Amino acid sequence: MLPGLALLLLAAWTARALEVPTDGNAGLLAEPQIAMFCGRLNMHMNVQNGKWDSDPSGTKTCIDTKEGILQYCQEVYPELQITNVVEANQPVTIQNWCKRGRKQCKTHPHFVIPYRCLVGEFVSDALLVPDKCKFLHQERMDVCETHLHWHTVAKETCSEKSTNLHDYGMLLPCGIDKFRGVEFVCCPLAEESDNVDSADAEEDDSDVWWGGADTDYADGSEDKVVEVAEEEEVAEVEEEEADDDEDDEDGDEVEEEAEEPYEEATERTTSIATTTTTTTESVEEVVREVCSEQAETGPCRAMISRWYFDVTEGKCAPFFYGGCGGNRNNFDTEEYCMAVCGSVMSQSLLKTTQEPLARDPVKLPTTAASTPDAVDKYLETPGDENEHAHFQKAKERLEAKHRERMSQVMREWEEAERQAKNLPKADKKAVIQHFQEKVESLEQEAANERQQLVETHMARVEAMLNDRRRLALENYITALQAVPPRPRHVFNMLKKYVRAEQKDRQHTLKHFEHVRMVDPKKAAQIRSQVMTHLRVIYERMNQSLSLLYNVPAVAEEIQDEVDELLQKEQNYSDDVLANMISEPRISYGNDALMPSLTETKTTVELLPVNGEFSLDDLQPWHSFGADSVPANTENEVEPVDARPAADRGLTTRPGSGLTNIKTEEISEVKMDAEFRHDSGYEVHHQKLVFFAEDVGSNKGAIIGLMVGGVVIATVIVITLVMLKKKQYTSIHHGVVEVDAAVTPEERHLSKMQQNGYENPTYKFFEQMQN
């Protein structure tokens, strides 16, 4: 009986996977679907061969709105009549995701929940009802909710009946990915387990939770997938850093990746993966262990928004993933996280309630146990070159301590509720309120400790970056002061200095992006400070670069290399600003006359060494000679001599060194608040732009607008007065002399006649006479 039922279930599941709504499109091998993974090109199902293909245009990535998803379905399936979209019930494994602008695609898979593109008129899914299972449905015509809402309704309904949700489908569409009901099948817990066990015994390649037809996790192959994914992600990071370090002889990059945490995370991930078997109990055990892990950022420095399952809250919560390492409690979306962890963890809690002596399924791992003074230990230890690794370990210890305390409180809460079953309602409410306050207190305490940890880490990183920049600047000036100066050495020192400034800017932007995602209000408050700091970095770089003018021979020899370095730095700044500052355009007045910034590039200009900075001094970097500085020919701006005022007008000659230059002249750029406020520094369309305000043209435009406004206002006032006067003017058809001695009735009749009134009696007799 059971093997036959297992085969029937397997056949039904296979038929369901290949089911396509009928709209005159017979013969399709697969259902139209699309899948998205942020940072990669979208994928869509090839309905002819059943394989996933990358975006045909090579440009489309994450889509935020359901309307956009529907439109994208219609674009990739133009021959089908796509009318709606709905999330799939289960996540799938997809390989060969492509990055935008790259020809070769990575082979490691990602787990995502695809969207089904519905063809033609909506037809509800045909659900298979196994033996001892019940088919149920709910419809509410006054409700129009998403797939996730109805999935939750179905799951809760089955849980109330002490059963497990076996399958479900949407009913009565009312919008894009919105429906008015759900149909579902509830099976007894033991029956569901037997069914899945039988199906797994027949089909070794099937996997309840990580199910993807393209991936085989039997015999430890899951380890290979995880390791390949992590190795390729680490390879990408190393490749990018290798590009940054190209031609850098002294290796000036800030190395913040710690191998020790990565190895530990890899070992922990591998140990979890190797326990996977083809039985449902083993799969659920692995899922419970995965979903009970604490969120780990990993040793890398990216800030990728991900989700993890929080066992204390019983729901998924966001966190930032570094890009490599970490563990498998790491999901792309909240829906995917709940789909994997929600059902198994709720079943575990139900079993725990029914069997008090059973092992606690959500018991936290004790590998990261910490002492109460874990944060204090980090705060008391001075920073060093391994600051990032120390910070990661301190953060993990803090999270472990917090989870231990929360787990203890939740166990106490559960025990208190069990003991309070026979108490009055008021006492039960008091118990609940007490533990809620305790949980909130622990959360607030943990948040404060996290904030203190992050602020300390930020301060140490800033101090380290400042030291590196100061050292690079001193080496650069020393190279310029050498007699005779060596052009190649000067260029290498200049490159190290530019990289140090670039690191400072990258750190500032990443911190701002983190604050903006966590606390948008605080991000709005510190935005002006961030922009001021970025402007200081640009001006400091410009001032340092201008020192090359004092050694014309060196400047001429390394001109091409410097141009290439600045172009690379400019492209990097454009990319970083476009990715990190994704906010609407902020206007500060005269930007309406500026050109479109889609074609505007941020240039690194040269500024005078002495004297005040002015907006007219900001010119693009061009080729220069030994005796003069070229002008910006496009805008016809006069050349700026970047040499000291005392040397302007004198003929420079090769070999004139900088023996009298002091480090203090350019080590720091001091800016008061008034100078910062009056600068022409703005952010437009995610790019950093310096521009010179044309004061004369702006005044003329303002005067013209004022005169035009006065004229228009005058015309409006005159028109209103005339209309009002006309409204209250009496209608006269002629002048009729009225005797003052007549009665009021006659006077009233006279006025009526003046306004066109005709006595019907008079009119009747006039007609009779005629």
Swiss-Prot record:
Q: Which gene encodes it?
A: APP
Residues annotated for Cu(2+) 2 binding in this entry: 677, 681, 684-685
Taxonomic source organism: Pan troglodytes
Region annotated Interaction with G(o)-alpha, chain positions: 732-751
Q: Where is this region: Collagen-binding?
A: 523-540
- Point out residues bearing the modification Sulfotyrosine: 217, 262, 336
Domain (E2) ranges: 374-565
Q: List the disulfide bonds.
A: 38-62, 73-117, 98-105, 133-187, 144-174, 158-186, 291-341, 300-324, 316-337
User: What are the entry keywords?
Assistant: Amyloid, Apoptosis, Cell adhesion, Cell membrane, Cell projection, Coated pit, Copper, Cytoplasm, Cytoplasmic vesicle, Disulfide bond, Endocytosis, Endoplasmic reticulum, Endosome, Glycoprotein, Golgi apparatus, Heparin-binding, Iron, Isopeptide bond, Membrane, Metal-binding, Notch signaling pathway, Nucleus, Phosphoprotein, Protease inhibitor, Proteoglycan, Secreted, Serine protease inhibitor, Signal, Sulfation, Transmembrane, Transmembrane helix, Ubl conjugation, Zinc
* Region named CuBD subdomain: 131-189
Residue sites binding Cu(2+) 1 per the record:
147, 151, 168
Which of the residues bear the PTM Phosphotyrosine?
A: 497, 757
**Cited function:** Functions as a cell surface receptor and performs physiological functions on the surface of neurons relevant to neurite growth, neuronal adhesion and axonogenesis. Interaction between APP molecules on neighboring cells promotes synaptogenesis. Involved in cell mobility and transcription regulation through protein-protein interactions. Can promote transcription activation through binding to APBB1-KAT5 and inhibit Notch signaling through interaction with Numb. Couples to apoptosis-inducing pathways such as those mediated by G(o) and JIP. Inhibits G(o)-alpha ATPase activity.
Provide the site residues for: Required for Cu(2+) reduction. 170
Q: Which residues lie on this side of the membrane: Cytoplasmic?
A: 723-770
Protein name per Swiss-Prot or TrEMBL: Amyloid-beta precursor protein
* Motif mapping: YENPXY motif: 757-762
* Residues that coordinate or bind Zn(2+) 1: 183, 186-187
Site positions (Cleavage) are: 197-198, 219-220, 671-672, 678-679, 687-688, 690-691, 711-714, 720-721, 739-740
Q: Which parts of the sequence bind heparin? A: 96-110
Q: Where is the composition biased (Low complexity)?
A: 268-281
Site annotation (Susceptible to oxidation): which residues?
706
Q: Which residues carry this modification: Phosphothreonine?
A: 729, 743
